[in-house]
Amino acid sequence: MNKLDKGKLIRIELTEDNLDDYIGYFNLIKESMPNPDFLMNISKPYLIEMLRKNSHIYAYIYDGLIVSSAMILPCDKNAVRLSGLDLDYHEVLEYGPQFVHPDYRGNKLQYFMIDDLRYVALDLGFKYAIGVIDKDNEYSNANAEKYGKLIKTIEEDGRIQNVYFNDLLYGIET
């Protein structure tokens, strides 16, 4: 693990014009995972479609290298319904995939990103967050339990998923 100074991280929001490096980074992450099936395959057209649907993709840069990334996805009515929560879906975001470069794992970057993006999400008008994580993805579930409450487990597309909830106004314990 390479140590880093989180104070030197630069957060950038990706646009349609700067997705190529992110796709290479995503493929590196997927190849380095013990179970790459936790991640779907992505393409530039898919990411462009997400951005056009008001999703936000953030990369965290350290010494010119993407070391971590996260997505903020607007929830739809169905996602909020599946959660079992009685919330206005316009106020709910879904945390999309969060990745950490293999050389920088162990620096608590996933936790750092969630706390950092909480302020971004509040500025975008969101009040609540939902995270859906494959039940077998132990590392991501352990991180999610630090910033959210496990509210239910569902079966979606033949996979067992844990659903976490976070009230963005109150943040997370650090």
PLM regions and their residue ranges:
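Short amphipathic alpha-helix that is part of the acyltransferase structural core
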Residues: 2-44, 59-61
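A short helix-loop-beta-strand connector motif used in the catalytic cores of GNAT acetyltransferases and
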Residues: 47-59, 68, 94
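Glycine-rich acetyl-CoA-binding "A-motif" of GNAT/NAT acetyltransferases
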Residues: 65-68, 139
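Conserved acyl-donor/pantetheine-binding loop and adjacent beta-alpha core of acyl/acetyltransferases
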Residues: 68-97
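A short, internal acetyl-CoA/4′-phosphopantetheine-binding micro-motif in the GNAT/acyltransferase core
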Residues: 87-88, 95-106, 133-134
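Conserved acetyl-CoA-binding loop-helix of GNAT-fold acetyltransferases
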Residues: 97-100, 106-119, 142, 146
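Conserved active-site alpha-helix within GNAT-family acetyltransferase domains
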Residues: 123, 134-154
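C-terminal "cap" of GNAT-fold acetyltransferases
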Residues: 155-174
